[in-house]
From Swiss-Prot:
Keyword Lipoprotein tagged: yes
Residues the record marks as carrying a glycan: N117
Species annotation: Homo sapiens
Topological relation to the membrane, as annotated: Lipid-anchor; GPI-anchor
GO cellular component, one term: membrane
Protein keywords: Cell cycle, Cell membrane, Glycoprotein, GPI-anchor, Growth arrest, Lipoprotein, Membrane, Signal
Described purpose of this protein according to its UniProt entry: Specific growth arrest protein involved in growth suppression. Blocks entry to S phase. Prevents cycling of normal and transformed cells. Binds 20(S)-hydroxycholesterol (20(S)-OHC).
Region ranges (Disordered): 254-328
One Pfam entry name: GDNF
Protein name: Growth arrest-specific protein 1
Propeptide segments, given as residue ranges: 319-345
Length: 345
């Protein structure tokens, strides 16, 4: 995982200085001012510019860092005052927990951070010491909401204002026999929710029963994290929309989003869908798979010219008043397998 990336925007839009050059500049400045014999690390922690130099010396880490710089550039550009990643500190609150309720890190950035953490030198970038580098400190604060979390947000846990990651919440549920049984029932009865189709009465009943269990309620309030974070967010989004008619972004269990950053990545995909969905294909019914005539109020005219097929061959959400199901929804089988295998990662 990566938090201190020294200017982190890399090749960010608007001409920001690449992180590697910022690192080199900091290195020259520190070498010129540091007393002779002073260590390059504070105790056992590397200074961040040193950690980045080591990363640049490893081909896998260097490549992953460049991928991070490209994928996460909009995060720093949007919340750091446009073209200046170093200004991010003024825009970010000290607590990622309060920030997560209204903003979600793009999945591209999350994936890049995970890949960087899988390299040999990548993890040192999270634990490194910024020393007196304010640009490094502000970048840490800016990128922190994108980092996978596997435990409570602080020593006090959720009760003390921290936010628990869903990986840890799942582990606690697995260790509790009652919660584990309820989770098994959830996986059995809520398959259509995973696929973004509908929330059945049986599924809604199971969810309400789980909310009454302290250990199971943690799964509702947790923040999606780890390798399965995109899947977890999709399931939470579908559950809020289909089962409770709620918009994602207001509850403590979501990562929140105003759509700005995700729209930046989805422009080409949307154009592709509009082109492919403009044909005369008839939508299929969710239950019998048989073509039916277009429903009243549907079609390109009702959806602002975007056509009937939001993300696949004729599938649409039957809940939420005809709203389109989220793009890239996972099949129930894939979601169940990944959720069951999640604790093993």
């Amino acid at each position: 995982m990566v938090a201190a990336l020294l200017g982190g925007g890399g090749e960010a839009r608007g001409g920001t200085v690449p992180g590697a050059w910022l690192c080199l500049m900091a290195l020259l400045q520190l070498l010129g001012s540091a007393p002779r014999g002073s260590g390059l690390a504070h105790g056992r922690r590397l200074i961040c510019w040193q950690a980045l130099l080591q990363c640049q010396g490893e081909p896998e880490c260097s490549y992953a860092y460049n991928q991070y710089a490209e994928a996460c550039a909009p995060v720093l550009a949007q919340h750091g005052g446009g073209d200046a990643p170093g200004a991010a500190a003024a825009a970010f609150p000290a607590s990622a927990a309060s920030f997560s309720s209204r903003w979600r890190c793009p999945s591209h950035c999350i994936s890049a951070l995970i890949q960087l953490n899988h390299t040999r030198r990548g993890p040192a970038l999270e634990d490194c010491d910024c020393a007196q580098d304010e640009n490094c400190k502000s970048t840490k604060r800016a990128i922190e909401p994108c980092l996978p979390r596997t435990s409570g947000g602080g020593a006090g846990g959720p009760g003390a204002g921290g936010v628990m990651g869903c990986t840890e919440a799942r582990r606690r549920c697995d260790r509790d026999s009652r919660c584990n049984l309820a989770l098994s029932r959830y996986l059995t009865y809520c398959g259509k929710v995973f696929n973004g189709l509908r929330c059945t009465d049986e599924c809604r009943t199971v969810i309400e029963d789980m909310l009454a269990m302290p250990k199971a309620a943690l799964l509702n309030d947790c923040v999606c994290d780890g390798l399965e974070r995109p899947i977890c967010e999709s399931v939470k989004e579908n559950m809020a929309r289909l089962c409770f008619g709620a918009e994602l972004g207001n509850g403590p269990g979501s990562s929140g989003s105003d759509g700005g950053l995700d729209d930046y990545y989805d422009e080409d995909y949307d154009d592709e869908q509009r082109t492919g969905g403009a044909g005369g294909e008839q939508p299929l019914d969710d239950d019998d798979g048989v073509p039916h005539p277009p429903r009243p109020g549907s079609g390109a005219a009702a959806s602002g010219g975007r056509g009937d097929l939001p993300y696949g061959p004729g599938r649409r959400s039957s809940g939420g008043g005809g709203r389109l199901a989220p793009r890239g929804a996972w099949t129930p089988l894939a979601s169940i397998l990944l959720l069951l295998l999640g604790p093993l990662f």
